[in-house]
Regions:
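Catalytic core of pol beta-like nucleotidyltransferases
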Residues: 1-25, 34-39, 50-104
Length: 104
């Protein structure tokens, strides 16, 4: 549990992500991926998917995650929409796959 999240929390988040066929992969980054998180650290996830992975989908996922009443803030982004080169390099360097859509 390098990222400091209980497995039950991870499974709840993965269950939400799995309900959205637009999400092909979720990558955990930030302090939780680096292992230098604090108890209340947020959960930074960037998502990979096709052209149908839009901000509207992100908002729906965030609404579903909010209903879980998790004791953590969850920040979602779409990897292909990130323009900050430093953030992209950080994700490439420390990011870990958190969820992957099952192959048919």
């Amino acid at each position: 549990m390098k990222h400091g999240l209980p497995e039950a929390v991870c499974e709840k988040i993965r269950a939400v992500l799995s309900r959205y066929p637009q999400v092909e992969q979720a990558i955990l980054y930030g302090s939780r991926a680096k292992g230098n998180y604090k108890n209340g650290s947020d959960i930074d996830l960037t998502l990979r998917g096709g052209a149908d992975l839009t901000l509207n989908v992100i908002y729906r996922i965030l609404d579903d995650l909010d209903e879980l009443l998790l004791p953590y803030a969850v920040h979602l982004s779409i990897l292909d929409h990130i323009s900050d080169r430093d953030v992209i390099e950080h994700i490439q360097r420390v990011g870990v796959v958190f969820y992957e859509k099952p192959k048919p």
